Curated annotation (Swiss-Prot):
The active site is at 363 (proton acceptor). Keywords: Acyltransferase, Cell shape, Cell wall biogenesis/degradation, Cytoplasm, Magnesium, Metal-binding, Multifunctional enzyme, Nucleotidyltransferase, Peptidoglycan synthesis, Repeat, Transferase. This is Bifunctional protein GlmU. One of its GO terms (biological process) is cell wall organization. PROSITE patterns: HEXAPEP_TRANSFERASES. It comes from Halalkalibacterium halodurans (strain ATCC BAA-125 / DSM 18197 / FERM 7344 / JCM 9153 / C-125). GO terms for cellular component: cytoplasm; membrane. The keyword Disulfide bond does not apply.
Length: 455
């Protein structure tokens, strides 16, 4: 197999998006479009990936990092000019180069590999990825010769009435012999209305030289969708969402309503998990087996253990053990660790805390910056008071402690093993193990007070 290279075009301004955000950084299923393209290419182990950047160059580099190399197109003078900027990285190297658009997030590694393999088998100098469209209006048509090779690509506006009947179109993805590509690019002119250098002109140059130009027609038309506006962005979102959800359903995950469930392409879900509508599984979240998620639940960059239920709640950047019950209306904030068999109930917020096995906070509690042992009970209205307006402090609660209703634990403070905090207490000092701590005003009953007051 030849050396393989990729050039990803990501320098266009994307004015039709009507956005301050650079076009290829708009997200599809939670990930920037250009990131999807890079991920698919990277999966094939290419020798080098060059991303052409221009508008928003720093933002694109920040997103992609060192996974790719970069070439700057300072002036946007067309797709041919853009690819030519990669010459410093790829010029003179033998191999095959595929040119991809950074706004085609649906293109898969499988299709990319098929195009390149077909190109090598055909021993062509160029291969065009094509698709058959029911309505090809606006697309360049593929005109083939009697041998089935590409004779020319005719833009819609230049096509004859007969050529407009052709339904095979150019998708904008090309595979080239690398050396032939850069040699031909230097011959591309800009004698057109826009004064730009167009990559498809390379096809005509190679044909004029008698070189072989092939076409690989994909059956997966939806993969070729280029996103140029918000309508196409929504279409891409729907296609990818369906693709992701169907893949998990085939692996044994139940989606009650796939159209209303959103799963990141980087997420992992275990067998026999059931996901209800309105649930979002975002980022690099890992879900165990036999879980119940939703409805209306958001999980992001978190790990959820087997047989855990998260209902109408939010979990971000945290780890949750097995057989845990969360919700409804709970919020697990970043850097939290919830161990096995814990109950986090309605209207409970946990932030940057560790909660030991079999502990419970069933309702209306805030647990922040805390180390909680095993079998601890937080009664209704329990609060760890962790912030003095400037600094955050630690609350430590040891195994088997019982925190009574409407209690405030003023950090830094330690509640000893098996200690009991009486309801309504405000605790400012450490409580020894097995102690009962009462920190509230003594109740006084004044008999007949109301009668005397009203007379």
């Amino acid at each position: 197999m030849s050396n393989r290279f990729a050039v990803i075009l990501a320098a266009g301004q994307g004015t039709r998006m009507k956005s301050k955000l650079y076009k290829v950084l708009h997200s599809v299923c939670g990930k920037p479009m250009v990131q999807h393209v890079v991920d698919q290419v990277s999966a094939l182990g290419f020798d080098e990936i060059v991303t052409i950047i221009g508008h928003g160059a720093d933002a694109v580099k920040s997103q992609l990092g060192e996974r790719v190399s970069y070439a700057l197109q300072e002036e946007q003078l067309g797709t041919g000019h853009a690819v030519l900027q990669a010459e410093s990285a790829l010029g003179g190297r033998r191999g095959v180069t595929i040119v991809l658009c950074g706004d085609t997030p649906l293109l898969t590694a499988e299709t990319i590999d098929h195009v390149m393999s077909y190109h090598e088998e055909e021993q062509a100098k160029a291969t065009v990825l094509t698709a058959e469209l029911a309505d090809p209006t606006g697309y360049g048509r593929i005109v083939r010769n009697d041998k089935g090779l590409v004779e020319r690509i005719v833009e819609h506006k230049d096509a004859t009435s007969e050529e407009k009947q052709i339904t095979e179109v150019n998708t904008g993805t090309y595979c080239f012999d690398n050396e032939a590509l850069f040699q031909a690019l230097k011959e591309v002119g800009n004698n057109n209305a826009q004064g730009e250098y167009y990559l498809p002109d390379v096809i005509q140059i190679l044909q004029t030289k008698g070189e072989k130009v092939a076409a690989y027609k994909t059956a997966h038309v939806e993969e070729t969708l280029g996103v140029n506006d918000r309508v196409a962005l929504a279409q891409a979102e729907q296609v990818m969402k369906r693709r992701i959800n169907e893949a998990w359903m085939r692996k044994g995950v139940t989606f009650i309503d796939p159209e209303q469930t959103y799963v990141s392409p980087d997420a992992t879900i275990g067998q026999d998990t059931v996901i209800y509508p309105g649930t979002m599984v975002l980022g690099q979240t890992t879900i165990g087996e036999g879980c119940v998620l939703g409805p209306h639940t958001e999980l992001k960059d978190s790990k959820i253990g087997n047989k855990t239920a998260v209902k109408q709640s939010v979990v971000h950047n945290s780890e949750v053990g097995e057989r845990v019950s969360i919700g409804p209306f709970s919020h697990i904030r970043p850097a939290s660790m919830i161990h096995d068999d814990v109950r986090i109930g309605n209207f409970v917020e946990v932030k940057k805390s560790t909660i030991g096995k079999e502990s419970k906070a069933s309702h209306l509690s805030y647990i922040g910056d805390a180390e909680v042992g095993e079998r601890v009970n937080f009664s209704c209205g329990s609060i760890t008071v962790n912030y003095d307006g400037k600094n955050k402090f630690l609350t430590k609660i040891e195994d088997d402690a019982f925190i009574g209703c409407n209690s405030n634990l003023i950090a830094p403070v330690t509640i000893g093993k098996g200690a009991l905090i009486a309801a309504g207490s405000t605790i400012t000092e450490d409580v020894p193990s097995d102690a009962l701590s009462i920190a509230r005003a003594r109740q006084t009953n004044k008999e007949h007070y109301v009668t005397k007051k009203n007379n």
